[in-house]
Amino acid sequence: MEVIKAKDFPPNFVWLNTYEPLSLTRLKGYVVVLDFWTYCCINCMHMIGELSRLEHKYRDRPVVFIGVHSAKFFNEQDVKNIEQAIHRYEIEHPVVVDEDMAIWRAYNVNAWPTIVIIDPLGNVVYKRSGEGQSEFIEDVIDVLLDRYTGKVATEPIRYKPSSRDTNNRLYYPGKIALDAEYRYIAITDSNNNRVLIVRLSDGRIIHKIGNGMRGLIDGSIDEARFFRPQGIRWSKDDGIIYIADTENHAIRAIDLDNKKVTTIAGNGRQGYYSKGGYAKDVQLNSPWDLEIDGNKLYVAMAGLHQIWLYSIEDSSISPFAGSGYEGIYDSDLSTAEFAQPSGLSLHRGVLYVADSESSSIRAIDISGRRVKTIVGRDLFVFGYKDGSVYDALLQHPLGVDAYKDSIYVADTYNHAIRAIDINARQIRTIIGRKEGIECRLDDSCTLMLYEPSDVKYNPNDDRLYIADTNNHMIRVYDKESKVLSTMKIVL
């Protein structure tokens, strides 16, 4: 059998989460696990969770996990943005920034995520793409540790893990929702594993739902637990707040009158392909956003590249649109393709979808049961361009909100809020980041958006409310005065 020697890391590449750059020479005697990832990718997010469990298992053994960040999007090539992703996903292992995908090419990688395992002698012994392979990784590590007993390093590598900024009231807020009377805003405070209800008039927190600890626990709003929730919708009929509890792979319901949280779909385990069924028995896959229509709850099932439908009436859930193949393909509901749908908005019988990995806005005609693309072209065609929707470019949009003849878009990786004129078929930038301006938390007048994940229009005050995720803020844009301000949130 041919022995394949591992290629060392280029000497001048940037390293994060470690005191010093690493090399395979330095790591001789260790089992090295390389994770080729890019932080936009839902499968990579899942792999981070799988590797976290293994990291803790082998914490005191000569095993080193290294993230090789090989960026897909322009925005993901920025070191500061990669640092934000490390904080957001609580990555504890070293990460090397793979400039121009040099390490990717050296290892002949062709998909995210890909795992490569290197034995203590520096030979590649395992290479596989895709998620759901933690058991295989574990088996290989155990075999190598056993095979090289007495020949491996005696101490684990010590490195500098990322530390969270505890000075912010919010921590990577994901999505927002307004109540029926536009008096309150609900916020998924994702990395604090909770939901906040805030009064718009004075910014005062009225309810904190969730105790801040990770978990899938129902009960009182003080005892309940979430795990990085994202999507949120406030029912105009009964006041129930629905939550896409993303990393629990579940849908939760918050009853503010009775101060209770209930799981209505999912069982905490990640599922793959399913025809659906009784919602509590069905395994979901990273639900990222929700939209409500009477007794129907639409779910952006990012991990399956589909839109699902939950029936509030009979507690069933099943795929609604999308074949499950990742792509951008317009067709009928069953054969159309989505790519990590992450935002939903229902308007005039059309369900608009922020289809993040295809950098597009899609439209589902509910009665006609067809999918079409409003703006966007392909999985690898993205950028920043206003004008005709046929020529315009987005970059990994996560949020969408339609009102009258406009579709507001949180164009996440362009750090912008865009508006699509449905009739004129034109797109323009409402809020954008100027060239060379850096985010400064001490100066709200010049603070630009930083990977905003959601936007909601409030017709009562003609303002846009924005989940400014990486700035850990809720921003407010007055359309008349064209002033962007920061919402003051107080206890």
Model-assigned labels for residue ranges:
Residues E83-A111, V116-I118:
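Short, internal strand/loop/helix patches
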Residues A186-N191, I241-T246, V299-G303, V353-S356, ...:
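Conserved beta-strand positions in repeat-built beta-propeller and related beta-rich domains
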Residues P120-K175:
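Thiol-/selenol-based redox modules, centered on thioredoxin-like
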Residues H46-R88, E99-I103:
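Structural microenvironment flanking redox-active thiols in thiol-disulfide oxidoreductases
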Residues S23-I42, F65:
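Short active-site neighborhood of thiol/selenol oxidoreductases, capturing the structured segment around
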Residues L178-Y182, W234-D238, I292-G294, L346-R348, ...:
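Residue-level detector of Asp-centered blade-edge/turn motifs that repeat once per structural unit
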Residues T154-G174, D202-R228, K260-S286, S316-Q340, ...:
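Gly/Pro-rich loop segments of beta-rich domains
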Residues M1-L24:
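N-terminal "domain-start" segment that seeds a small globular fold
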